[in-house]
Regions:
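Amphipathic alpha-helical assembly/interaction segments
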Residues: 1-122
């Protein structure tokens, strides 16, 4: 697994994909109505940013319980993000279909990363 050879969290494929997803979310949400700037836009962006941020935190954490907590937060943010995308679609805030496959890929990679990291002794 790449995590064994990674020296920084930026070298992790799961972090790289999550970061690319955040950039896509920012671009997508730029087109939300101004009235959403402090609500859905903010919620969507915070949930998206939480994914790579939690992966980065888990990378440096040495305690397994802390690693598990960080990765669980990231996984929860994936699910929250899915809901926000559904809500944005239902509110008519543009087409986000290109984001769904990215989010699914991040979720799958995160699941595999969590299994490997939590099965590894440090």
């Amino acid at each position: 697994m790449e995590s064994a050879s990674a020296k920084t969290f930026q070298e992790l494929g799961v972090w790289q994909k999550a970061h690319q997803f955040v950039l896509a979310v920012y671009h997508y949400s730029d087109y939300f109505p101004q009235k959403e700037v402090y609500s859905l836009t903010s919620q969507l962006r915070r949930a998206a940013v939480s994914i790579p941020a939690s992966i980065a935190e888990a990378f440096k954490t040495t305690e397994q319980s802390d690693k598990a907590r960080c990765l669980n937060v990231a996984q929860g943010s994936v699910e929250a993000r899915l809901y926000y995308l559904i809500l944005a679609t239902d509110l008519g805030y543009g087409d986000n279909q290109q984001l769904l496959p990215q989010l699914e890929e991040v979720g799958r990679l995160l699941e595999r990363y969590a299994v490997v990291m939590l099965d590894t002794e440090f």
